[in-house]
């Protein structure tokens, strides 16, 4: 196995101290002879030898002027080629590739034969130049890093180093160090060696290749320092470090590089710890930006249809209008049949409250109630306009603060009854202050939704006595408003087939009402008399005083109602009410409910003249349980409707118009009878409509 190295461009300098002789291995196999060995020539310049070497060299016959004798690693030194002494410390070996290889081979063979004849022994011993032990260790570790031991630990063959052998004309150069000076040899050529070769062979022939050092100065310095130390310790350190072809020779060379300190400089724990100690806060996390506002934006819209339809063009009430309303209300109070002293006292007290600028509560209350009055639509406001001879009546359904503070609701109802009955009824006494407070709290707690039309009982009073009123007062609602303020709500648009009471509730009065014609009056005698009963839907049970006082107020109305001859109109109202109960909430809403609650605390004992009021027995109220959505709705029903239900349940007090309804009621509520059976799944039902609905499910699933 041959390892080739090119030394054409680099000079390898190595010491020759502690050189040993190399045993020549005779190879009897001619096939292993390597004829490609490049010969070397020895160029000696300024070589300094010790005294023993100088004496040996001076005894030779070779003169210095003969030039440089040839010398190669693959042949022993001839006797005639003596190394002269010079004044330099370096010995350079240079390759001479221009010489004839065949001539050198013949010369080497002749030298071998002469040497064998001179020694006369079986083992041919030659003395020649070789590399030092440290160099052998490096070469061995380069090619065989896993092998042990190193060549330095292998015992070498004994060599004979005679000073001068004149008989065989051989010279043995045993280089020694004199006074610390070293002799260096620099070979320069390509070397091909083989273990079993008849020429010069190193102890580790396979590992005889040299390495390249890119920094010769640093390498020479390390070699000089290391050669002064122990050879064995040096070889052990080299074998453990497994040095490669980078030119590093020992551990001290690695330590001189300070690789660990360089790594510590680049990756420092202090640098990592103190990295975020600056005040710039560049490495901290950026705070999140607030995208939405902290509070939602407030809009004017309530997201309801009623808000967008009712408030877009209502006129604003200025303080002058409020004062006018205050004066009108005071005049109407003084002109009523109520007690003059009580009315004057209330008007004066309220005017003082309204006129005092320091009373903030009263001012805020007036403004709030005025806004609520604008918010709710009142169709009874403009049924009659105030003239110089007549006073405008206060509307009980509107949220009027002046009306609430000047006149009690019971007095308002009494004034309306007196106006309808041509002031023939007596006024009632004023309520106590506690009743007034309870009425105000109930009024605000039961505020009606603005989108529903407000129709109170005063409308029916005006309808009954319309012929007795001034024709100038019969005007449509909102007739005095400007064109920009008049609008029609969607709930006011009715079809032509709508009932009369629905048209009155939405569009107001008109001259072509069928129940106000003369035909209606002619049919008054043929129409049976009936009574109207105001029912309160899903309200709390009234106290006995409440029911008696409410029936008393109703009796005032019916005491004079037959005298007007309007039974036909009332019958038509009742019949239309039965036909269209779900059309529009009729005849009173929250204000009427509040008035009834207020009436419960009032007691009408006598008239202004002291004459007692005749009490008549009327049918009691009948209450129905309704859904919470219609808790505040109030309707008018006649007693004739109650009499038209002859089929009474023997278990509960319910009555029905038809017997089928009674049977269905008994089957579904009071008994477990199931006469209607399904012919598909054998389920039984108490009602036929339930069976029909069940059969539809079978059709939907494809069972039929």
Curated annotation (Swiss-Prot):
Key words of the record: Activator, Cytoplasm, DNA-binding, Metal-binding, Nucleus, Phosphoprotein, Repeat, Transcription, Transcription regulation, Zinc, Zinc-finger
Biased composition annotated in UniProt, kind: Low complexity: 141-166, 228-246, 593-608
Main subcellular location: cytoplasm
Record carries keyword Nucleus: yes
Gene Ontology terms for molecular function: cis-regulatory region sequence-specific DNA binding; DNA-binding transcription factor activity, RNA polymerase II-specific; zinc ion binding
Zinc finger residue ranges, C2H2-type: 647-665, 676-698
One Gene Ontology cellular component: cytoplasm
Domain of life: Eukaryota
SMART domains on file: ZnF_C2H2 (SM00355)
Basic and acidic residues: compositionally biased ranges: 91-112
Annotated localization: Cytoplasm; Nucleus
Motif (9aaTAD): 261-269
Residues annotated with Phosphoserine modification: 288, 304, 451, 582, 633
A GO BP entry: cellular response to caloric restriction
Composition-biased stretches (Polar residues): 113-133, 167-193, 204-220, 426-437
Region (Disordered): 84-246, 418-437, 592-634
Its biological purpose: Positive transcriptional factor that acts as a component of the stress responsive system. Recognizes and binds to the stress response element (STRE) which is involved in the response to various forms of stress (heat, oxidative, osmotic, etc.). Involved in the regulation of the CTT1, DDR2, HSP12 genes. May be regulated via WHI2-PSR1 complex phosphatase activity.
Subunit structure: Interacts with WHI2.
Note: Present with 125 molecules/cell in log phase SD medium.
Free-text domain note: The 9aaTAD motif (residues 261 to 269) is a transactivation domain present in a large number of yeast and animal transcription factors.
Protein name: Zinc finger protein MSN2
UniProt source species: Saccharomyces cerevisiae (strain ATCC 204508 / S288c)
Taxonomy of the source species: Eukaryota, Fungi, Dikarya, Ascomycota, Saccharomycotina
Gene designation: MSN2
């Amino acid at each position: 196995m041959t390892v080739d190295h090119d030394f054409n461009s680099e000079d390898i300098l190595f010491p020759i101290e502690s050189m040993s002789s190399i045993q020549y291995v005779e190879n009897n196999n001619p096939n292993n002879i390597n004829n490609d060995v490049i010969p070397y020539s020895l160029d000696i310049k300024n070589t300094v030898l010790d005294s023993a070497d100088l004496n040996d060299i001076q005894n030779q016959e070779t003169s210095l002027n003969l030039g440089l004798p040839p010398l190669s690693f693959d042949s022993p030194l001839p006797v005639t080629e003596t190394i002269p002494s010079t004044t330099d410390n370096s010995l350079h070996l240079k390759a001479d590739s221009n010489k004839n290889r065949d001539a050198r081979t013949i010369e080497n063979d002749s030298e071998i034969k002469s040497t064998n004849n001179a020694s006369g022994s079986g083992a041919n011993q030659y003395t020649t130049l070789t590399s030092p032990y440290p160099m052998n260790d490096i070469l061995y570790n380069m090619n065989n890093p896993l092998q042990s031991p190193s060549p330095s630990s292998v015992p070498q063959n004994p060599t004979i180093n005679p000073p001068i052998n004149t008989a065989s004309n051989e010279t043995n150069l045993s280089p020694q160090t004199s006074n610390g000076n070293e002799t260096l040899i620099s070979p320069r050529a390509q070397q091909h060696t083989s273990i079993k070769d008849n020429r010069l062979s190193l102890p580790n022939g396979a590992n005889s290749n040299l390495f390249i050092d890119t920094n010769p100065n640093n390498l020479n310095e390390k070699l000089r320092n290391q050669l002064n130390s122990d050879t064995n310790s040096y070889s052990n350190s080299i074998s453990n470090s497994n040095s490669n072809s980078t030119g590093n020779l020992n551990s001290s060379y690695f330590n001189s590089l300070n690789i660990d300190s360089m790594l510590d400089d680049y990756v420092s724990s202090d640098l990592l710890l103190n990295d975020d100690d600056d005040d710039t806060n560049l490495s901290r996390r950026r705070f999140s930006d607030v995208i939405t506002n902290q509070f939602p934006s407030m809009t004017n819209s309530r997201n309801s249809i009623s808000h967008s339809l009712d408030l877009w063009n209502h006129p604003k009430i200025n303080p002058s209008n409020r004062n006018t309303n205050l004066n009108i209300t005071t005049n109407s109070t003084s002109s009523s049949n109520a007690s003059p002293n009580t009315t004057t006292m209330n008007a004066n007290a309220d005017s003082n409250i309204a006129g005092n600028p320091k009373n903030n509560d009263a001012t805020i209350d007036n403004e709030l109630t005025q806004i609520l009055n604008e918010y709710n639509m009142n169709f009874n406001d403009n049924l009659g306009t105030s003239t110089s001879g007549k006073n405008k009546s206060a509307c009980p359904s509107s949220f009027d603060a002046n009306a609430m503070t000047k006149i009690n609701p019971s007095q308002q109802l009494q004034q309306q009854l007196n106006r309808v009955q041509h002031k023939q009824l007596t006024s009632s006494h004023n309520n106590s202050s506690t009743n007034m407070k309870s009425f105000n709290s109930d009024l605000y707690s039961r505020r009606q939704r603005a989108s529903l039309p407000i129709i109170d009982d005063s409308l029916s009073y005006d309808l009954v006595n319309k012929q007795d009123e001034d024709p100038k007062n019969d005007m449509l609602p909102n007739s005095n408003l400007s064109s920009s303020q008049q609008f029609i709500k969607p709930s006011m648009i009715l079809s032509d087939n709508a009932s009369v009471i629905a048209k009155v509730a939405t569009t107001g009065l008109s001259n072509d009402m069928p129940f106000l014609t003369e035909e209606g009056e002619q049919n008054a005698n043929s129409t049976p008399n009936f009574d109207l009963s105001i029912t309160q839907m899903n309200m709390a049970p009234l106290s006995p005083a409440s029911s008696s006082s409410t029936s008393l107020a109703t009796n005032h109305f019916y005491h004079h109602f037959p005298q007007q001859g309007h039974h036909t109109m009332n019958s038509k109202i009742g019949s239309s009410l039965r036909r269209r109960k779900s059309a529009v909430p009729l005849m009173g809403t929250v204000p009427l409910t509040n008035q009834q609650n207020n009436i419960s605390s009032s007691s009408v004992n006598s008239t202004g003249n002291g004459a007692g009021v005749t009490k008549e027995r009327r049918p009691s109220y009948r209450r129905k349980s309704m859904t919470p959505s219609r808790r505040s709705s109030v309707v008018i029903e006649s007693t004739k409707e109650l009499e038209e239900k002859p089929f009474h349940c023997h278990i509960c007090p319910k009555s029905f118009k038809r017997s089928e309804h009674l049977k269905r009621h008994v089957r579904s509520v009071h008994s477990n009878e199931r006469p209607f059976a399904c012919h598909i799944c054998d389920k039984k039902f108490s009602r036929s409509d339930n069976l029909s609905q069940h059969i539809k499910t079978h059709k939907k699933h494809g069972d039929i």
